[in-house]
Amino acid sequence: MGHNPVEPRLGSLDNSGDERDREQTMSLYVAALWRYPVKTLAGEQLSSATIGPDGVAGDRLVRVRGPEGVRTARRQYRLLGLHGTLSADGTPLVNGYRWDSAEAAGLVKSAGGQDAWLEPADEAERFDVLPLLVATDGAVAAFGRDVRRLRPNIVVGGVPGLGETEWPGATLQIGRAIVRLDSLRGRCPMTTVDPDTLERDPEVLRDIGRRFGGRLALNAEVVRDGTISVGDPITITWDR
């Protein structure tokens, strides 16, 4: 992409001079974008996306449900073997089938249990925490595994090491859009599932606990909407 991130000088975020140094020395950019039209299924990688109060447009429009309530890949891990995408007219698809089709219903029952079904997502339960999840390339590299295990919406490039641990409370400006970073995300058993083979490795979650305090990537929300694209430069600021 032509980006050559520069190592920032690390220091206390309480020092405004250090904050200015960071803003001047980090060359940040959008490294990847993801959307998950069907909650808990594998998602789709994007070249550009519109973001707003509900996160990435088209994200988590449909969910899997069972008699007990919302059903996810935390327990029904084979759901991660299905792919949620959006059609050209904005309809959620499961492996290319309309979400409300008999074909999609059969796939979900096969992966998530015979008593599972699909339904439009309830706004109150649409997102586990906040509408966006922001990962950084430095933390993903330290994690040492496929970024798909973390299910981010935005991957920020040009971040050295675990710099994201100092980002809660910061804001990212990407073109017109502004994103507020709230907190580090506590990780769940979905990270233990290989996105290609669906093999489970409990050691992955234990490793996240040991090396990252159980938290990777950042919960975030959109302060000002806009359209963002892979390669767009990012400016980070701290309001402290």
Question: Language-model segments: which ranges?
Answer:
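Metal-cofactor-dependent catalytic cores
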Residues: H3, L10, D14-R240
